[in-house]
């Protein structure tokens, strides 16, 4: 599977370029993004774990699997702000793609009501602290 993905990327540089440009444009349109301090605060809030699965994302060894997921995707007009983001394993972030969090999350085998409540706590906390 990895070889297929690598080959696809090599054969489709134009598609990757267009995707990356569209993504950057959406991020620019949807807000300022997250500061490093906000990112660290978010990671600490979730104990350096994936908000969805609870898998540990801390440490250098996990740099390649750690990502930030937009709860409401940018393509659905979600904001590129800290209150719309959670730490996610890159695999689950890609799996969710452009779906809203709840519709995707409740179908996952690792779904947890406790973690869902933690996500809602984060949204409430971050909105109160950062939303103007």
Question: Which residues are covered by each model-predicted region?
Answer:
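Contiguous alpha-helical segments
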Residues: 1-65, 102-132
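Histidine-centered nuclease catalytic patch
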Residues: 52-90, 96-103
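Glycine-rich loops and low-complexity Gly/Arg-rich segments
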Residues: 91-95, 112-115
